[in-house]
Design a protein with these regions (language model features):
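Negatively charged, Asp/Glu-rich surface segments that serve as flexible interaction/assembly modules
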Residues: 53-93
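C-terminal charged interaction modules
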Residues: 92-143
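Charged, low-complexity surface segments at secondary-structure and domain boundaries
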Residues: 32, 66-73, 103-107
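Short alpha-helical segments used as structural interaction elements across diverse proteins
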Residues: 46-48, 79-81, 101, 122-123
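A generic structural signal for ordered alpha-helices
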Residues: 21-24, 64-68, 100
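Short, charged/polar N-terminal "headpieces" of proteins
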Residues: 1-61, 129-143
Length: 143
């Protein structure tokens, strides 16, 4: 069994890692996000909720006759749910604003570059084991 432990990722994904944030200019800020990985319970629950919601969204979209309006509606809902999944993987942050679901969603919507970083980081299991920075922008580093 001990040999199998080398492959276990869930505990590290649930523990999370602090990732420093950089401003859009590339300058380092004093802020950070604590991110959970794709193997975390939070990610699993959020993606299950998203899959269920997307079924309802497709049914609702079917009622929209205009093809372009239907596309815009579905695209908006997909983006909203993507951010919900990403926000579930933010367990803490350094901002004075409380780290609530609503605040995380507002932040990700207003700062899509941060949403991209979160999406890239949480999917790279190596980063939860302190193994490099593959997939991160060069201005990002892992604590």
């Amino acid at each position: 069994m001990d040999e199998m432990n080398e492959f276990f990722t869930r505990d590290k994904a649930n523990e999370g890692v602090e990732v420093p944030l950089y401003l859009p200019t590339g300058a380092k800020s004093k802020h950070w996000l604590k991110l959970l990985g794709v193997d975390s319970g939070a990610y699993a629950l959020a993606t299950a909720r998203m899959r269920q919601a997307l079924q309802g969204i497709q049914a609702e979209a079917g009622k929209i006759e205009d093809k372009e309006a239907r596309f815009v509606f579905v695209n908006g809902k997909q983006e909203e749910w993507k951010n919900r999944v990403l926000s579930a993987c933010i367990s803490a942050w350094s901002f004075e604003t409380e780290c609530t679901e609503a605040e995380k969603l507002k932040f990700l919507e207003a700062a899509p570059q941060i949403a991209n970083i979160v999406d890239t980081f949480i999917a790279d299991r190596r980063l939860f084991f302190g193994m490099g920075q593959a997939g991160l922008k060069t201005s990002q580093e892992v604590k």
